[in-house]
Amino acid sequence: MARIKGKDTKPELIVRQYLYSRGYRYRKNVRTLPGTPDIVLKKYRVAIFIHGCFWHGHEPHLRLPKSNREYWEQKIARNRERDEENKERLRRLGWSVMTVWECQLRPECRRDTLLEIEYHLNHNYLNQFRQPRPYNDTETGTPQVAESNTQYQKTTE
């Protein structure tokens, strides 16, 4: 397991290259945030985790090794728990969290996944400015719209 890369994996590079080509600027592997998200877009308040299907237990694609099965079940269960804890901590800090699975970046569905990431970023950014503001009526009395004394004269032609 010491040879397993934790940074700059192929799925991460695919997402980062797409975001950069579309004009998004980001930080990678930000250690100051819970869970050290793979990609952080501070302007959009979005943290993106890119998970491998095996290591993080993505159900449709999870195949445990036949040897030492109990160890792998516990390890992957703990990874899932830790992922959920980190996501919840980020949400409490005001971050929107996205999880992109390795299988979502396969060539047949990559385009849809990348467009979905971009949609989420834009939607999240716009929602920062759409916060409802309470109406405050600070004026007392009814405001006057028309002139106070207007004399209308009949015009003759």
Protein language model regions, located:
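Nucleic-acid endo/exonuclease domains
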Residues: 1-99, 103-157
